[in-house]
């Protein structure tokens, strides 16, 4: 079955990508019924794609095979993931795309993070008594929807680095949405788990036909989404941000209690940023600046841990997990106090990473003792300026979002590391009627209780944890890392880097080594594989790891071997993710 799909897909893309025209009559055959044929590790000499869905990886890989570059492939992949992983990301959301330009050697971030509409207010997540509305309620309301940025981000990426048009790259995904594809276990579980949320909106007709959730192996057809993609193909991004669609989207948000208007959509624009940089054991790390907290606290935790010589302890020892947990507590305390949109608040970026502040935080970590009251420090002592906000304690009921991450590298040296999201599974659950676009709940990433760095304000971007990252050695990109998972993203990227560099693990082993995640004394998670006796030891010291393991993150990664001229792509085993290497035929 896979062979038939590949032949058809390749033939169609040959016409599209080589001829450069769009044959609107072209038909894409149905994809395979099984996803277990795809590789979780692959090697290529001419490029690599690693994504969270095999069909998206196929589409990205074929773009590369037919002469498109990594940026072209990334755009095609995002459209494909909107269809195949509709619960994770799409044009109703936003994200952070990091691009290394193989020609100029520059590294750039396209920030397509959603923004609050003009009508948003700091107290919009409080009830009439001034108490925070429970997260489970605010996450499905129109007030949770941020102005989507993904489509504008894709447009900007193609304008800056692309060699193929959006019109061309969106075409194959239109067929995938129209003709459908077999639902995998991940999507089937998500539909089942979130059917109540979906049943409230136009999404019920897509995912709950006849009132019953679609199941694994069923064909998911999304004709309304295909119609929207056709509008974008013919009219560009204006078809989304202006006109009839924009009115329908904003009216839908208002129907669910939000304030978004057509003007909010028309006024939206992306931000182009430089990454923040850090050094770690001979590597240079490029990662995300605010409004994502990911980069700052990834670098801060690496700096704190660097002097502890972590690899002197076994990778599954209680000592290693103790040092990780204590470091996470300190960094996540800082995150809760000082991180926000730098267009609105002062973020002490230099102070948080200052060597003297790092030493100050290191001194709070004791190998044999749990710090039972981890608190934010005062990074403002180490840089000019001051906070224009307070430290405000927030409710503990927030559920971490999901998101998707993927990464692409090509034979011209271009590299993309891209994390993209609608936040929770299926976002708010709100679908734009007749257009098939699922809307994000990104504004619940703001603080519910105002006064802090991350309070709601009009046109402000909510705090993010997305951490698309590229590591360099001798000024050459050698590794990409990223993950979904809300605030767990930072810890997933951290541990992958630690296991690969500090412990010297192969990339596959580093990606799959069991992870922990803890932000405070009341929030603990761990993956299957962390030894039970180690958990008992840690809990005996005062930690509070529970009795049941859970999956943390879903890392996608590419390593680049410049000496041998090869790319290795790695995704999680036992998933429907796929790494596909590109090996072009030589004459």
Curated annotation (Swiss-Prot):
Q: Does the keyword Disulfide bond apply?
A: no
Q: How is its activity regulated?
A: Inhibited by glucose.
- What pH-dependence text does the entry carry? Optimum pH is 8.0-8.5 for transfer of p-nitroanilide from gamma-glutamyl-p-nitroanilide (gamma-GpNA) to glycylglycine (gly-gly).
Instruction: From the UniProt record, give one GO term of the biological process aspect.
Output: proteolysis
**Residue positions of the active site:** 403 (nucleophile)
The annotated dependence of activity on temperature is:
Optimum temperature is 60 degrees Celsius.
Major subcellular site: secreted
Pfam families membership: G_glu_transpept
Q: How is it modified after translation?
A: Cleaved by autocatalysis into a large and small subunit.
Positions of the propeptide segment: 29-35
Keywords, ordered alphabetically: Acyltransferase, Glutathione biosynthesis, Hydrolase, Protease, Secreted, Signal, Transferase, Zymogen
Recorded E.C. number(s)?
A: 3.4.19.13, 2.3.2.2
Q: Which reaction does it catalyse?
A: an N-terminal (5-L-glutamyl)-[peptide] + an alpha-amino acid = 5-L-glutamyl amino acid + an N-terminal L-alpha-aminoacyl-[peptide]; glutathione + H2O = L-cysteinylglycine + L-glutamate; an S-substituted glutathione + H2O = an S-substituted L-cysteinylglycine + L-glutamate
An example molecular function term from Gene Ontology annotations: leukotriene C4 gamma-glutamyl transferase activity
Question: Which residues are recorded as binding L-glutamate?
Answer: 113, 421, 423, 442, 445, 464-465, 485-486
Annotated signal sequence is 1-28
- Protein family (similarity comment): Belongs to the gamma-glutamyltransferase family.
Q: Which NCBIfam families match?
A: g_glut_trans
Q: Its quaternary structure?
A: This enzyme consists of two polypeptide chains, which are synthesized in precursor form from a single polypeptide.
Q: What does this protein do?
A: Cleaves the gamma-glutamyl bond of extracellular glutathione (gamma-Glu-Cys-Gly), glutathione conjugates, and other gamma-glutamyl compounds. The metabolism of glutathione releases free glutamate and the dipeptide cysteinyl-glycine, which is hydrolyzed to cysteine and glycine by dipeptidases. Uses glutamine as a gamma-glutamyl donor and acceptor for gamma-polyglutamic acid synthesis. Dipeptides are better gamma-glutamyl acceptors than free amino acids.
Return the protein name. Answer: Glutathione hydrolase proenzyme
The organism named in the record is Bacillus subtilis subsp. natto
The gene it comes from is: ggt
